[in-house]
Amino acid sequence: MSLPEIKYCPGTLAEGHSTYSRTCLNRVFNGHSVQHVLPYDSPATNQETDDLFAENRKRISISGVQEKFSVLLEKNKLRLINEGEHGAYILKPIPGAGKNADQMPANEHLTMQIARQVYSIETAENALIFFKNGTPAYITKRFDVKEDGSKWAQDDFASLAGRTPQTHGEHYKYQGNYLELIELMKVHLPAYKLEAPKLFKLLVFNYLFSNGDAHFKNFSLLETPMGDYRLSPAYDLLNSRIHIEDKDFALDDGLLPRSQAKGTVLQQFYLLAQHAGLSEKQVDDILKGITSGQNKVASLLGASFLSEKIKLNYWQAYQTRLKKLTQIHNAI
């Protein structure tokens, strides 16, 4: 694979850039003039590269099925961490399994950019980056790392719920329903009323963009400079249907406990919002915002690094979900 011709910023997807735009460099790389090409071939390219990534693989402690590598920024260069070092970035190459696996980095990058640019959802800073052989990878800046290298405390919702593979089995991340996230926030977050609308908006976004892998570990609370907690920036957003045959929701019971999960998906969203203490106006405003922005979505999709075939699949999935939300919403 050769390096692609770059016409859009691989960070913001803004037109007219042959590498990262100044906006992207400021947001993602603290203003450093980082190149969009890494000084490595992709994993499994040759023995030397393989050994390098195998060493790094032992050092990263973030769980998940997709391989992730820890990277730090040294002057204007990104490199894999050495023993005893702590990375400020996570690098996610093309995974070794899954349908359309080569599209996963561009899928996650696009979905994260749509969340931020179209719907003003706070997200982890991110960009697309390329190995020397032209293979793409997704890179994201860790929001739990301070400027001095120390860490903000972060608790994902599986930890808050006391769920581990030992206590709840291998499927622990996917058990239950999204109402449980709301209830956990009420217990652990004094600023709950400020954060609940953000969580609700993110859940609607995940539905609209077919993110069927939004499990308990993909939501977190993050320590603030004041020493209290808030909902962390969104992360791991992508259209999972492009890669696996997925359900509408990651959690086994969907939005609500099975005893309450009646009616259309939109009626269930309204009931979930009621449990969360959101007013009808708040819900209407969130739904109105989330079901608008088609032109902006189309523009970012067109600028994205997805293949033309997958761009079409992505758009069709979005339109199908949008129709479900808008038709029913207009009827209520």
Language-model features: locations:
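Conserved kinase catalytic-core segment
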Residues: Q103-Y119, G176-H243
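Short alpha-helical scaffolding segments that buttress acidic/His motifs in well-ordered protein cores
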Residues: L199-L203, L287, L300-L301
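ATP-dependent phospho-/nucleotidyl transfer catalytic cores
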Residues: K132, A137-L208, L256, Q268-L271, ...
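C-terminal regulatory or interaction extensions
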Residues: K151-W152, R163, L238-D246, G277, ...
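Conserved ATP-binding subdomain of kinase catalytic cores across diverse folds
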Residues: E48-G169
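A conserved long alpha-helix in the C-terminal portion of kinase-like catalytic domains
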Residues: L194, E245-V297
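A residue-level signal for conserved active-site and pocket-lining positions in enzyme catalytic cores
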Residues: V71, A115, F157, D213, ...
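Regulatory N- and C-terminal appendages and interdomain linkers associated
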Residues: M1-T49, E55, D228-Y229, A298-I332
